[in-house]
Amino acid sequence: MGLPELTFSLEKAAGTVSARMSAGAVALILRDAKDNGVYTIHRESDIPAQLGAANVTAIKRAMIGYINRPSVVYVAVIATAAEISAGFAALAAYSYDYLAGPVDMPASDATTLSGLVKAQRKKRYIGKAVLPATAGDDEGTINFVAAGIKSGATTITAAQYVPRIAGLLAGTPANCSATYAALDELTAITPEADPDTAVDAGKLILVDDGRKIKLGRAVTSKTKLAATDPEMLKKIKLVAA
């Protein structure tokens, strides 16, 4: 499949007003010593006042969106020593489209979240997890792989940036694609040596076209299809539809 050719469509401009107004919900699991609990965030003033700076930044990144802002951001704040599964369980009563984890999330947490989402999707759960470097081979796991991310003088890890990606995907209307969505705040990345191979391996990557840094082809981590599986399981837009 690889990256798409740089062709442009008028679909965005031709979309209906109702479709443009549509936006999904984001859920974040964050670890913090204070303000533990679940919060519903519609605006920056809803962010708990005592959260650490990195967690506040994560929420603000999730709120940026793309064509639209996310309809809402649900934030489960768990204790610093709590299991990631506790945050997932705390969000069980909430309906959301994209989930992201703590900004310092280790690989073990990402693997756990991928497994939890995969199990829940068998019960008609619609959420998808945006996780750093997690090859889940599942339509419910979005494997965000990026390095050398910079916004001016600030270096950002993939784990710190997944809330931004989750918010961008949630802010993409159903009649549009997140492929080549511009990330205007970014100034540098380490480019993939072979972008097409990365995309075919189920990696959601960043690309630099020399003018802007953008999202690559909007794919899920699904790479192996059974005989009865449709090709659309590899594409975020069609899985989300």
Q: Which residues fall in each region the model found?
A:
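A glycine- and small-residue-enriched flexible loop/hinge signal that marks low-structured segments
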Residues: 89-241
